[in-house]
């Protein structure tokens, strides 16, 4: 166990060094990339993230969002939900924002933002155990949670649930924040919030739980899939996706298979609610309805034909060919049942079969023989 931890730590240090070297020229890294390549794969606890940020900063790397804005920009946004449309509230997602969300945004929108000096004073007070300062620091950054949470809408959780999970991460950030390291609180809290939300999505959003690092890999693959769709004008092949993501086609197929969502058999089909998906899926264990119906009709026709024979003839055929229990018997076995010789049973059987071959009887069974 200890060796595994040492190996993981060594691998992580190598990855961080490579990350800094690859971004040294630009001096900038996207926050999503930091999360996907460093935070999630190594399942960093949030208290370890500040050390990572410090190492990146010391390495000359600044953290931004995908639009190139500093990752702290969310903390200074004014939220006025009454002036925003659903699309503006949730970015490019098409989900509708309901009244509870708007009410919540209105409530947090009236909380005044903090200046750098106020933030520092509150952080010091929190370290000294001031509960009121802790509450003020958290409330002033609730809109940060909203801004981050809206980037994860459409991944299987309701917007308010994402906000709730993000708020849990925010509270942890308030407890652990160390102002003396020089980071703005919003920079530090962002990672706690993102980690709380991504873990919640991995744990709750899917019927079958998928590890956090795999969830991020799936999300990245889906993004590349969409980009290729726009570039090519058609759905990309696993080979094309693999080339873009620097992995093998087999690995892409494996990820796509993992990404598939289970579908409930109770899923409604059509406009009426009385039809469900399960109604249209064949049960391979149960006998095919057509075969079952054919077998029942054959049994009925056979019984009718056998009724035209004598009782002894009928019973001999039933025993010889196993018509009742599926077990065929020899002439000798049947002879013992009737206490006659096997030759006598052969004669009775031959006479019964001649009768069945007569057109008046055979026509009832001929269709089944031809099928």
Swiss-Prot record:
PROSITE patterns: SIGMA70_1, SIGMA70_2. GO terms for molecular function: DNA binding; sigma factor activity. One of its GO terms (biological process) is DNA-templated transcription initiation. Keywords: Cytoplasm, DNA-binding, Sigma factor, Transcription, Transcription regulation. Residues 216-292 are annotated as: Sigma-70 factor domain-3. Pfam families: Sigma70_r1_1, Sigma70_r1_2, Sigma70_r2, Sigma70_r3, Sigma70_r4. Gene3D superfamilies: RNA Polymerase Primary Sigma Factor, Sigma-70 factor, region 1.1, Winged helix-like DNA-binding domain superfamily/Winged helix DNA-binding domain. It is found in: Cytoplasm. Residues 305-358 are annotated as: Sigma-70 factor domain-4. Residues 331-350 bind DNA. Residues 137-207 are annotated as: Sigma-70 factor domain-2. A motif (Interaction with polymerase core subunit RpoC) lies at residues 161-164. The keyword Transcription regulation applies. GO terms for cellular component: cytoplasm. It comes from the Bacteria. Belongs to the sigma-70 factor family. RpoD/SigA subfamily. Sigma factors are initiation factors that promote the attachment of RNA polymerase to specific initiation sites and are then released. This sigma factor is the primary sigma factor during exponential growth. HAMAP family: Sigma70_RpoD_SigA (MF_00963). Interacts transiently with the RNA polymerase catalytic core. This is RNA polymerase sigma factor SigA. It comes from Streptococcus mutans serotype c (strain ATCC 700610 / UA159). The gene is sigA.
